Amino acid sequence: MAAAIAASALPGAFGRLVSVCSRSILASQGSGSASLWSASRRFNSQSASYPQGYVPKTSLSSPPWQEVVLPDPVEETRHHAEVVKRVNELIATGQYGRLFAVVHFASHQWKVTAEDLILIENELDIKCGERIRLEKVLLVGADNFTLLGKPLLRKELVRVEATVIEKTESWPKINMKFRKRKNFRKKKIIVNPQTILRINTIEIAPRLL
């Protein structure tokens, strides 16, 4: 009889224990969510105190090097006009010395001056003795000035002429392949066509535009 009473009382006690535990867990969760909510409100209030477009000071927002100050456009224009005037005076009086140029020809860039020889590892469809004009001029310069192209100088500003003086072949190059104990041996002789040009003149316009 006593055992039956104890067995009947056990489910009720267990149910009360479960309800008490669930209430304590819910209460703890409620306090935690409330604390998180209050913390988020404090963070939002602190972030709202910064001005709009605020960027924290870091190595990216504030680089360690000095800020580049661009020149005044009016002053730059005046200085450019003075330089052009001085270069025009040097060209008009012929007091610029020996001219040199950088030309682009046959997929290469060549720094040349008058009476220079350039060897081109290619065959050109030009006969010996013919005179050609090198139109792709990247820059031309003298002792006191240099004119740079962006990327090329205008054709009416500078003129570089050359003459084909020789068309020949390169010295034979032997390419030998050998594998030991494989009875493999391969020999190849490479001969490339060559063209030699002589730079005749480098002329510049009498006045810069």
UniProtKB/Swiss-Prot annotation:
Its main location: mitochondrion. Keywords: Mitochondrion, Ribonucleoprotein, Ribosomal protein, Transit peptide. GO terms for molecular function: RNA binding; structural constituent of ribosome. One of its GO terms (biological process) is mitochondrial translation. It is found in: Mitochondrion. It holds the Pfam family Ribosomal_L21p. GO terms for cellular component: mitochondrial inner membrane; mitochondrial large ribosomal subunit; mitochondrion. Residues 1-43 form a transit peptide. Belongs to the bacterial ribosomal protein bL21 family. Component of the mitochondrial ribosome large subunit (39S) which comprises a 16S rRNA and about 50 distinct proteins. This is Large ribosomal subunit protein bL21m. It comes from Mus musculus (Mouse).
